[in-house]
């Protein structure tokens, strides 16, 4: 049975077995929000309370710290993003802003780690039914380089280059997109 038009011209999902239903656009907006909430929480490891990587590497078993994960203050052991829930929500809102206002262009992330932020951008495009944009992924896929303190004095002493966990292959990133059904 197809959706009908309500008294105000809005599509209404037909009632089944006496169930009360909502206007179709309200339902679509709610389902889009729920889907993107679920994707964000999964990508950050909040959904399954993924412990921080340093606890796993160090052999300890500290409990999941939601406040740290929301702020992006830890590296998840298996989740696909380290930027935290607050930044992921901001990224979603920024992506939706340009879609809603018709700003043209593709999306890109430079330095993707496991690909979580670009997977979210791709999920936003899918949730909004956008088919004329791409999400570009740019990375060396070799981890971080040694700091060049001569050119970038503020990088002196930064030793993130020693963490092998930051080197994630392009195939691993593609696999992350595929796990969410978003690999093009």
Labelled PLM ranges:
Residues 23-36, 42-85, 101-184:
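S-adenosylmethionine/decaboxylated-SAM
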Residues 3, 13-15, 19-22:
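Short, low-complexity intrinsically disordered segments enriched in A/P/G/S/L with frequent Arg
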Residues 90-101:
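Conserved alpha-helix/loop element of class I SAM-dependent methyltransferases that forms part
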Residues 2-8:
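Extreme N-terminal basic, low-complexity initiation segments
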């Amino acid at each position: 049975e197809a959706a009908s038009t309500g008294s105000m011209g809005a599509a209404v999902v037909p009632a089944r077995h006496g169930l009360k239903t909502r206007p179709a656009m309200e339902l679509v907006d709610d389902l889009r929000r729920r889907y993107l909430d679920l994707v964000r929480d999964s990508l950050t490891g909040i959904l399954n309370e993924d412990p921080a990587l340093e606890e796993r590497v160090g052999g300890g078993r500290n409990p999941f710290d939601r406040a740290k994960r929301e702020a992006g203050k830890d590296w998840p052991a298996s989740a696909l993003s380290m930027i935290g829930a607050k930044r992921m929500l901001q990224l979603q809102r920024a992506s939706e802003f340009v879609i809603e206002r018709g700003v043209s262009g593709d999306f890109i992330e430079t330095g993707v780690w496991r690909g979580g932020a670009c997977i979210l951008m791709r999920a936003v495009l899918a949730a909004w039914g956008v088919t004329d944009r791409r999400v570009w992924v740019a990375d060396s896929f070799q981890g971080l380089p040694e700091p060049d303190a001569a050119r970038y004095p503020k990088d002196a002493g930064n030793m993130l280059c020693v963490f092998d966990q930051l080197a994630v292959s392009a195939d691993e990133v593609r696999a992350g997109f595929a796990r969410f059904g978003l690999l093009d």
